[in-house]
Structures are given as C-alpha cells and as structure tokens.
C-alpha cells in the first residue's frame, strides 16, 4: 500500500534506469570529474588534459572513452588531434545538485 502523502517515484527510476546508471558510471571517478571541471571551461585536446591532470595520455584517453560511451562528452577531429567538449551543459547542473546533496547530508569521503 502506497503512502498517501508521498509523491510517486520519479520517472527517471523507471525504464531509464540503465541510462541513469551509465551516466553515473561515467562520473564515478575523481579523474573523470576533474576532466569535467576542465571541459566546463571549454574545449580541450587530449594533450591539454594530459598536461592539466599530470596523467599518461593512455589514462586520459581511457577516461574520455568511458565518458563518451556514457554520453558525457563529444569529440571532433582537429588535424590529427581530438578535441573534447561537454555533450550538454546540463551536466554541470547535475554536479551542482550532487554538491548540494552532499552539503545537506554532511557527507565527505
């Protein structure tokens, strides 16, 4: 029996659960969150992200591939380089909501 005072489950938890899980998998790594932070400032080549993050090119490329597969970033060719950008600006709203949630519950890990 459903509680009369509770709102029904948001539709995001229904048929789109797989897509939502993929979205959060794409964000579930501190390095990927740092990549989002850099891409929020504008497009970056892989070599630029490597320099900013201090990681191997293969590591950064692997994270970008995961993020691309999850629909978080897009890429375009620029000569022999790939230039990455955030797929949608709403991603930043999601991260702000996550920060607000963490602030509300006082969780820091």
What are these regions (language model features)?
Residues 14-59, 71, 78, 82-91:
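N-terminal helix-turn-helix DNA-binding core of bacterial DNA-binding proteins
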Residues 66, 71-72:
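Short hinge/loop at the helix->beta-strand junction immediately C-terminal to the helix-turn-helix recognition helix
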Residues 1-19, 88-109:
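Amphipathic alpha-helical dimerization/coiled-coil segments
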Residues 72-75, 109:
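Low-complexity, flexible helical/coil segments
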Residues 63:
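Residues within the DNA-recognition helix of helix-turn-helix
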């Amino acid at each position: 029996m459903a509680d009369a005072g509770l709102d029904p489950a948001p539709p995001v938890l229904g048929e789109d659960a797989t897509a939502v899980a993929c979205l959060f998998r794409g964000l579930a790594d501190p390095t990927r969150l740092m990549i989002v932070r850099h891409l929020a400032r504008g497009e970056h080549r892989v070599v630029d992200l490597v320099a900013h993050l201090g990681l191997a090119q293969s590591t950064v490329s692997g994270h970008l591939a995961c993020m691309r597969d999850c629909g978080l970033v897009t890429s375009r060719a620029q000569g022999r380089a790939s230039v990455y950008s955030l797929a949608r600006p709403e991603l930043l709203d999601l991260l702000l909501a996550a920060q607000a949630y963490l602030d509300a519950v006082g969780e820091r890990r």
